[in-house]
Design a protein with these regions (language model features):
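A generic local secondary-structure boundary/capping motif
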Residues: 62-64, 84-87, 111-120, 126, ...
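Catalytic-pocket segment enriched in acidic/His residues
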Residues: 5, 9-10, 46, 52-57, ...
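Short loop segments at secondary-structure junctions
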Residues: 20-21, 131-135, 155-156, 187-189, ...
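N-terminal non-catalytic cap/leader segment that marks the start of a structured domain
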Residues: 1-94, 188-191, 206
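Structural signature of FAD isoalloxazine-binding scaffolds in flavoprotein oxidoreductases
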Residues: 89-107, 120-122
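Short beta-strand segments
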Residues: 7, 74-75, 98, 123-131, ...
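RNA pseudouridine synthases
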Residues: 130, 136-152
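Short aromatic-centered micro-motifs
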Residues: 15-16, 128, 200
Length: 218
């Protein structure tokens, strides 16, 4: 299943992708957020004939695939090729950082470069969308808490992040620095999570290529 949100900023509708047709899920859930994401949503949708759901205009803006996420955490320097190109030792422990949830935006929305920014940068990432609360979760049980995956473009202001003291969050959290989407792909549709190609283009020029097989912390 592929879940997404479409419409103007602040009035997005929950939707599901039916092949290439966007179907309205407003009759099923109010929004795609921490209150609706989970096994119950998947089980409910499985019982539906989604071809009978209203079709939405394919030209509608695609919003962030998750509304108001409660946390936005990242793992820094987690691709081996990225670490090596910077002549850095691959980390033995995960480098965990946070982005303010207010930086979340739609995948095609404009990114606003902050005033006085000198080193705005970008990285394509894959995100794990957590589907239920948990604590002290064992590695063997961890996958049971994953609802699905989505793409993230992790924007950073590198000077603020690296050249000034303090936590990374100040260089990671400017408004629009967290485009996510276009949709959440449920985990059952990903056959091999650690063999996915990813790429990023800037103004039509390919700037990044990689594969999830190069992830260090898995």
């Amino acid at each position: 299943m592929k879940f997404l949100r479409v419409g103007n900023i602040g009035s997005e509708k929950p939707a599901i992708l039916d092949n290439h047709i966007i179907r309205d899920l407003s009759s099923v859930i109010k929004d795609i957020d921490h209150t609706s994401i989970g096994d119950n949503l998947i089980n409910t949708v499985k019982k539906l004939d989604i071809s009978k759901l209203p079709q939405l205009d394919s030209n509608l803006r695609i919003g962030a695939c998750v509304s108001n996420p409660t946390k936005f955490l990242g793992i820094g320097l987690n691709f081996l090729d990225h670490a090596l190109e910077q002549n850095l030792e691959p980390p033995k422990e995960p480098i965990i950082f946070s982005k303010a949830t207010t930086c979340v935006s739609g995948p095609n929305d404009d990114v606003i470069i902050p005033k006085n920014s000198n080193k705005t940068d970008w990285e394509v990432e894959i995100a794990f969308v957590i589907g239920k609360k948990g604590k002290n979760i064992s590695l063997a049980e961890a996958e049971n808490y994953i609802f699905g995956y989505c793409l993230v473009c992790d924007f950073s202001e590198r000077e603020w992040q690296k050249n000034r003291s303090g936590q990374w969050i100040k260089g990671k959290s400017a408004d629009t620095f967290g485009p996510i989407g276009p949709y959440i792909v449920t985990k059952d549709e990903i056959k091999d999570l650690y063999n996915l190609n990813m790429s990023l283009d800037v103004n039509g020029k390919r700037m990044q290529t990689g594969n999830t097989s190069k992830m260090i912390i898995k």
